[in-house]
């Protein structure tokens, strides 16, 4: 998973998911997810160096070579992270990733014993698109996609305590605050989203 939740590796999951599967639409605009490819790396490098991303992702400004070295193994399915590009009306506008929490390494989730737990991170690349409900739609789309895998038991996310925008977004998407924790990146709010209970096949009399 790496030593930072900034541009460095977070810890393949769902490598068989094809672009545009399990898409979720919001009216009147469409928010979808596709797998990230190597062709997205220059765009991702530019995104990661935008001020509002730097603010929340560790303050570092990596070179393209550094971004390529860290993200290309994920794209190629060589590590335990799956990266996605969020699309707004078909155009890239956000980055998202999921990872298997168990065995993340580097001090992350050392007490985790459930192989079905997935972590996730999201970030909107365009600051002008913040506070428009798109983050919530993106998180919901990723939640839906991940829970489509029957192996997944629950989802977790760990925003910084002062990132109130992110915390509100995740709560709207179905996450709940569990506790304050200390991660290798510092203090965080540990949030969980449980798998929805199966709908009973028996109809009410």
Report residues per predicted region:
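Terminal substrate-recognition subdomain of acyl/acetyltransferases
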Residues: 6-10, 15-27, 171-205
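Conserved GNAT-fold acetyl-CoA-binding loop/helix
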Residues: 52-72
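Conserved beta-strand-loop-alpha-helix junction that forms the acyl-donor binding cleft
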Residues: 156-167, 183-187
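Conserved active-site alpha-helix within GNAT-family acetyltransferase domains
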Residues: 136, 161-179
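A short beta-loop-alpha structural element at the N-terminal edge
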Residues: 31-46
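Conserved GNAT acetyl-CoA-binding A-motif
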Residues: 148-158
């Amino acid at each position: 998973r790496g030593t930072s939740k900034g541009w460095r590796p977070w810890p393949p999951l769902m490598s068989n998911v094809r672009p545009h599967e399990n898409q979720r639409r919001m009216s009147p605009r469409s928010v979808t997810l596709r797998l990230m490819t190597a062709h997205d790396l220059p765009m991702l490098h530019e995104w990661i160096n935008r001020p509002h991303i730097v603010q929340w992702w560790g303050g570092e400004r990596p070179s393209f070579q550094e971004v390529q070295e860290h993200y290309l193994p994920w794209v190629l399915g060589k590590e335990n992270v799956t990266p996605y590009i969020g699309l707004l009306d078909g155009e890239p506008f956000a980055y998202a990733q999921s990872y298997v929490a168990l065995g993340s390494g580097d001090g992350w989730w050392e007490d985790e014993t459930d192989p079905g737990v997935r972590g996730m991170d999201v970030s909107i690349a365009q600051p002008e698109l913040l506070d428009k409900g798109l983050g919530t739609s993106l998180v919901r789309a990723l939640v839906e996609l991940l829970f489509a895998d029957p192996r997944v038991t629950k989802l977790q996310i760990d925003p910084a305590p002062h990132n109130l925008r992110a915390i509100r977004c995740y709560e709207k998407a179905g996450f709940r605050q569990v506790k304050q924790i200390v991660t290798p990146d510092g203090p965080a709010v540990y949030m969980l989203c449980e798998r929805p209970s199966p709908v009973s096949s028996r109809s009410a009399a």
